[in-house]
């Protein structure tokens, strides 16, 4: 049985980052709403509790409080931003509205020596005070400490930016240690979880396989399972894990809608049917999908058509498998959290995979979600541990509608053929081009990134087909061919993104190869838009 940390969510946009930091310390944790019952908290039996931030005001919203059981358990508690404020109020301190709000970067001075911040600092002042570079986002502030607490940190505009009751293991910080802008934040969360809560760092994916396999076998018994295999990371890892558990009781259905990446169908079949010896039904439905997309230019309409056709094709195939009692999905933990589907009284909706939404009810199948407790990086780690090739597990995200939303306007087979070849060249060049010291000196990458491929240094990269023609010259002849745009971004969370500053030499090779090797294209452009204002995908 793993030690557990309970994270109570008060509505912060970055609560998932808290959980990721805890998991990165190899400690299991779960996010649950702040209004869970005392009974739930006691039954969860955490080794420690973390209270998240919130957009709410502590003194205006008296409903957003931690359950009393949190304070009765006798385990350490860390309050972050709003979490610190509700800790103060619930334990007898005072919180007031501040006319000097703090949003963004700040420097916090540590006071005294506390178990949480001992030895953790970004720099020291001439007077010897330890200073921390942090990220603030608050309007209210604690103005009176609860009994038993001492001052732990401050800023000029927030005299109580941190507080500690060492005897009970209660700590509050007004800043956000979970975000990357707080440079020592990861160390603080690790200190709280590993040392103050005294948890065992035993949440390791390689060890998780045995537990997951046993759980799947207990759930499924001798019944059969079907899974929609897309070639994406989540469905691929789910398929490999379920196959490890129940072998031929799993049937994967791989639908080729004609909008996949170059050789993707072959790669999926080679991996699952060839290497893992899994049962895979390969359906070429490209004519059906492309036929229904004829004349359609609206992006949302294209998505709906592709989703609808997938459901029809998958449903028809699933009905042939009369012995199947389970539908497996690659749902991961962020999907569960965002849909309110955590393991509490609020677990009313499950965010279905975009391709199979509604299918469990339609087909009368039970739902199997073996990855629902894992974050994306944990899913990738699990995939490698299961023997999937890293180039499959660490592929960039690919939209469910595939190239259908990377072809602007109407989708045609010819357009898809041109795009997938251009996209493959771009990805190939990114994979084989290694970041150099010259790239670092030019500010294109960090010094510690030298030696990595530019594919690994970008979060997502792809080509976009533009249905416009431009004039060009090839040899002695004039051409009038199509244009492709290359897009590469760097991001930590995909909520915001910077366009990747790729070396000109790399972009030049991509352009030369695409124009020379893909007949029908004569111009290549590079997208230098960030998110916001642009989105990562064009449609």
Curated annotation (Swiss-Prot):
Its EC number is 6.3.5.2. Residues 4-202 form the Glutamine amidotransferase type-1 domain. It catalyses: XMP + L-glutamine + ATP + H2O = GMP + L-glutamate + AMP + diphosphate + 2 H(+). GO terms for cellular component: cytosol. The keyword ATP-binding applies. GO terms for molecular function: ATP binding; GMP synthase activity. Residues 203-395 form the GMPS ATP-PPase domain. Signal peptide: none annotated. PROSITE patterns: GATASE_TYPE_1, GMPS_ATP_PPASE. Keywords: ATP-binding, Glutamine amidotransferase, GMP biosynthesis, Ligase, Nucleotide-binding, Purine biosynthesis. Pathway: Purine metabolism; GMP biosynthesis; GMP from XMP (L-Gln route): step 1/1. ATP binds at residues 230-236. The active site is at 81 (nucleophile), 176, 178. Disulfide bonds: none annotated. Homodimer. Catalyzes the synthesis of GMP from XMP. HAMAP family: GMP_synthase. This is GMP synthase [glutamine-hydrolyzing]. It comes from Cupriavidus metallidurans (strain ATCC 43123 / DSM 2839 / NBRC 102507 / CH34) (Ralstonia metallidurans).
């Amino acid at each position: 049985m793993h030690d557990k940390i309970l994270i109570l969510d008060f509505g912060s946009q970055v609560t998932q980052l808290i959980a990721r930091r805890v998991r990165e310390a190899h400690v299991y944790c779960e996010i649950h709403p702040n209004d869970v019952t005392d009974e739930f908290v006691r039954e969860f039996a955490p080794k420690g509790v973390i209270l998240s931030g919130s957009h709410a005001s502590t003194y205006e919203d008296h409903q957003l409080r931690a359950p009393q059981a949190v304070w009765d358990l006798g385990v350490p508690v860390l309050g972050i931003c709003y979490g610190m404020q509700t800790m103060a109020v619930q334990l007898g301190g005072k919180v007031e509205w501040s006319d000097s709000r703090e949003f963004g970067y700040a420097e916090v001075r540590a006071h005294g020596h506390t178990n949480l911040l001992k030895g953790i600092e970004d720099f020291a002042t001439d007077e010897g005070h330890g200073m921390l570079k942090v990220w603030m986002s608050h309007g209210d502030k604690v103005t009176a400490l609860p009994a038993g607490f001492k001052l732990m940190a401050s800023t000029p505009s927030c005299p109580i930016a941190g507080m500690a009751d060492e005897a009970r293991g209660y700590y509050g910080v007004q800043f956000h240690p979970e975000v990357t802008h707080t440079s020592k934040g990861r160390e603080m969360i690790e200190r709280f979880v590993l040392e103050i809560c005294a948890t065992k760092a035993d949440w390791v994916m390689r060890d998780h396989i045995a537990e997951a396999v046993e759980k799947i076998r207990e759930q499924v018994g001798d019944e059969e399972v079907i899974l929609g295999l897309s070639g994406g990371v989540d469905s691929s890892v789910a398929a490999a894990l379920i196959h490890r558990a129940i072998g031929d009781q799993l049937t994967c259905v791989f639908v080729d809608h004609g909008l996949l990446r170059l050789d993707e169908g072959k790669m999926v079949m080679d991996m699952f049917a060839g290497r893992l010896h899994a049962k895979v039904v390969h359906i070429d439905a490209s004519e059906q999908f492309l036929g229904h997309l004829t004349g359609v230019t609206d992006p949302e309409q294209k998505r709906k058509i592709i989703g609808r056709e997938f459901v029809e094709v998958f449903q028809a195939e699933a009905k042939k498998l009369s012995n199947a009692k389970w539908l497996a999905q690659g749902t991961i933990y962020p999907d569960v959290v965002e849909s309110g589907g955590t393991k509490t009284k609020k677990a009313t909706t499950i965010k279905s995979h975009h391709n199979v939404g509604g299918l469990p009810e339609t087909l009368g199948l039970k739902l199997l979600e073996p990855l629902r407790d894992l974050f994306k990086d944990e899913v990738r780690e699990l995939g490698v541990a299961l023997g999937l090739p890293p180039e499959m597990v660490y592929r960039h995200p690919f939209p469910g509608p595939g190239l259908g939303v990377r072809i602007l306007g109407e989708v045609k087979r010819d357009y898809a053929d041109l795009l997938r070849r251009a996209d493959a060249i771009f990805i190939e060049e990114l994979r084989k081009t290694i970041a150099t010291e010259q790239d670092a000196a030019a500010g294109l990458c960090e010094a510690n990134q030298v030696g990595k491929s530019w594919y690994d240094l970008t979060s997502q990269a792809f080509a976009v087909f533009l249905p416009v023609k431009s004039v060009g010259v090839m040899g002695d002849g004039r051409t009038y061919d199509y244009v492709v745009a290359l897009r590469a971004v760097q991001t930590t969370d995909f909520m915001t993104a910077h366009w990747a500053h790729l070396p000109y030499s790399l972009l030049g090779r991509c352009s030369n190869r695409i124009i020379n090797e893909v007949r029908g294209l004569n111009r290549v452009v590079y997208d230098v838009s960030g998110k916001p204002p642009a989105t990562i995908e064009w449609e």
